[in-house]
Amino acid sequence: MNIDYANLNLQYQNYKKNIDDAIVKVLKNSKFIMGEEVSKLEKNLEIFSGVNHAITCSSGTDALLLAMMAMDIQPNDEIITTPFTWVSTSETIALLKARPVFVDIEPDTFNIDAKLIEAAVTKNTKAIMPVSLFGQPADIDHIQTIANKHNLKVIIDGAQSFGSTYKNKTDSNLGDISITSFFPSKPLGCYGDGGAVFTNNNNYAEKIKMLRVHGQNKRNHHKYIGMGGRMDTIQAAILLVKLKYFPKELINRKIVADHYTSGLSDILQTPTIKPNKSSAWGQYTVRVNNRDNIQNELKKKGIPTSVFYPVSLHLQECFQYLNYKQGDFPISEKACNEVISLPMNAFLTYDQINYVVSKIKEHIS
């Protein structure tokens, strides 16, 4: 049996006519930049997320940049974040000449350990940037309490978690600003790069809308130094179609996750979802010993897996200048040696899930 990790083609086949029609409409109208589909998508994202402002952009990475630029993050400002995530989180901080300050993670959720954050706050700290890793929000109440105490901003990196919830609020409606990514393999993905910034702050929203168009406040007049960060109309058209089916896909992803957990929880560490939270199941990530051997064995059986992430950010070459060293974040480092992500998409069948579970059990037992 061969299994597709994300199965984007099967998803496309299910929605083919609507997606094709949406793309053809854009081609006929030829409004490839900031066409009507962009504003329609933003309105629908606001409704789905329960937030006042959704501003689409060119990628999740650019969404992080736009969020920090809107907050006027300056060189040498410090932003507290996690070392166990995709590089964009800290890369964008560094691109603005600010400094990522890492705090270790919780061993069960892989999210930043809120109990350790306050010790990392200095006079230069301007914001906390938790990542909703693998689809589940971090301990936002605890983080927000620290932020309020020290007059800090909170930016939610929800690149992997669109559709998740924390105390019945969507992940996009947390913090001062939240972002997400619409990279194709994300819970809600387009057919290229795309992202969005979410906020209830009118001033941030107004500024972000200018920043994504080179800081332009009216045609050929530029209030800020900005960037070319708009979402293409075709991507917006695709997302408009897929957003209609997204609630059902979220349900299906949870069913897949629950079935995995039922079959695997007695032999390895399966994901922990904390009370008052739901996950968008951007990944289904477990811990195993002899991770590389297990990954190779599963590959032989036609089961694709991924490792997110093999090297903690504080040990990446690009962040050597931060002067962290091996052993500084032991929970993150241990996770890098043990995590493996199993196939996760809304179209996995029970037979496929059972096959994955059985092959893992064969190798571990």
Label every model-predicted segment.
Residues 30-78, 92-96, 102-104, 169:
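Phosphate-binding glycine-rich loop
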Residues 180-181, 195-200:
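Short beta-strand-to-turn element immediately C-terminal to the catalytic PLP-Schiff-base lysine
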Residues 1-29, 36:
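N-terminal "arm"/small-domain region of PLP-dependent enzymes with the aminotransferase-like
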Residues 14, 73, 253:
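Pyridoxal 5′-phosphate
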Residues 55, 80, 101, 155, ...:
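Structural detector of well-ordered beta-strand residues that form the stable sheet scaffold
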Residues 156-189, 218-223:
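Conserved active-site segment immediately N-terminal to the catalytic lysine
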Residues 9, 38-43, 48-54, 115, ...:
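PLP-dependent aminotransferase class I/II
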Residues 69-158, 165, 363:
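PLP-dependent aminotransferase-like
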